[in-house]
């Protein structure tokens, strides 16, 4: 949808579309008509109908949708929220994992923690059970 074609809707207009025959969602100030997607939604149609006509941004992000799901949303976008009713909540991005950092930290923890535990156990045993010969 190009910017000159973008329709705008109010929250009140979106709220009218809250049934399984007419299901609109507001996500990140964008309006999506997901009626045709209800039966295809991997999480079931109930979760979409429950959010129909409402701002579903938080619930959408809490689920942690994949990049494929985010790309798929584009075809259901029918417009945007009017400027005066938009929220300034920044879109959460997918977490970026640094495998290099995790691997380095994990390898240190994987041998350091058991080493310290063995040392503590050895000292405990020697102190309490080894005892000094008298």
From Swiss-Prot:
Q: GO MF annotations for this entry?
A: heme binding; metal ion binding
Name the domain of life this protein comes from: Eukaryota
Q: Membrane spanning segments where?
A: 111-131
Where do the annotations place heme binding?
41, 65
Query: One GO CC annotation, please?
Result: endoplasmic reticulum membrane
Q: Where is this region: Disordered?
A: 86-105
PROSITE patterns named among the record's database cross-references: CYTOCHROME_B5_1 (PS00191), CYTOCHROME_B5_2 (PS50255)
Q: Which residues form the Cytochrome b5 heme-binding domain?
A: 6-82
Q: Tell me the membrane topology, using the record's own terms.
A: Single-pass membrane protein
* Alphabetic keyword roster: Electron transport, Endoplasmic reticulum, Heme, Iron, Membrane, Metal-binding, Microsome, Transmembrane, Transmembrane helix, Transport
Location(s), subcellular: Endoplasmic reticulum membrane; Microsome membrane
Query: Which GO annotations describe the biological process of this protein?
Result: response to oxidative stress; xenobiotic metabolic process
Q: Where is the composition biased (Polar residues)?
A: 87-105
Q: What does this protein do?
A: Cytochrome b5 is a membrane-bound hemoprotein which functions as an electron carrier for several membrane-bound oxygenases.
Query: What's the family?
Result: Belongs to the cytochrome b5 family.
Could you tell me what this protein is called?
Cytochrome b5
Q: Which organism is it from?
A: Drosophila melanogaster
